[in-house]
């Protein structure tokens, strides 16, 4: 939950001692986003600017600073680090909704730390627990369980230095009154480097609707199947990889 800086190349014009600017042919992040027609049935594009996305993320990160996180070494860091670098001149965002399901894609020339993503969603960090300590929801307990998903097939495969991380998350929230909500979401992150794009980060998140607070809990509904999300993220990656053709 995001225009490419141009590199000016000077070429000496033979015989006249002058230089001419050769335009950078790299595509801008906005050119590498999914098209509305690529989205799953029922999703409708909604307005969202890079500035609005970054501001919304910043509020969530500030709130998270006062929460207890266990294991503490699993506290996510990649989102906050990248968020501080997002600007309208280096990023583009696509947002869409289907009823209460939200989808956000970000393409940016800024580098995301995928190693931190992998660490925070696997191994001993595949299950984490967050406890809210301040405000009206103090005492709320949030358990997040991550499941790794396969990297979608790409023509020619990922090149040296490129990588991708995909996860499915199941979030179980126990409120102070003991009511329990569940929510299923997906996230995909990739670093790609192609001649037509330069190095870019592609990230796609889909958040399903949270269930009503009940006890015993009501299972959350997945916004997409695992295979459906992998396929959609594959389309997002192909927007970059196919641009070289």
Enumerate the predicted regions with their spans.
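Bacterial signal peptide processing site
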Residues: 17-19
């Amino acid at each position: 939950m995001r225009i490419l800086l141009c590199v000016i190349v000077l070429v000496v014009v033979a015989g006249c001692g002058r230089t001419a600017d050769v335009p950078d042919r790299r595509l801008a992040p906005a050119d590498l986003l999914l098209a509305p027609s690529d989205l799953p049935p029922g999703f409708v594009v909604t307005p969202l600017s890079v500035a609005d996305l970054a501001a919304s993320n910043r509020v969530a990160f500030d709130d998270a600073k006062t929460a207890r996180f266990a294991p503490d070494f699993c506290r996510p860091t990649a989102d906050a680090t990248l968020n501080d670098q997002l600007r309208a001149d280096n990023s583009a965002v696509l947002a869409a909704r289907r009823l209460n399901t939200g989808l956000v894609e970000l393409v940016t020339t800024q580098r995301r730390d995928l190693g931190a993503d992998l660490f925070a969603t696997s191994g001993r960090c595949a299950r984490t627990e967050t406890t809210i300590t301040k405000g009206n929801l103090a005492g709320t307990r949030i358990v997040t369980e991550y499941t790794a998903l396969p990297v979608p097939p790409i023509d020619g495969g990922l090149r040296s230095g490129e990588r991708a991380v995909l996860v499915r998350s199941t979030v179980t929230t126990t409120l102070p009154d003991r009511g329990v909500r569940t929510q299923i979401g997906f996230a995909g992150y990739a670093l790609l480097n192609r001649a037509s794009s330069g190095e870019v980060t592609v990230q796609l998140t889909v958040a399903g609707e949270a269930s009503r607070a009940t006890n015993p809990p009501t299972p959350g509904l997945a916004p997409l199947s695992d295979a459906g999300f992998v396929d959609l993220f594959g389309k997002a990656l192909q927007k970059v990889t196919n641009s070289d053709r």
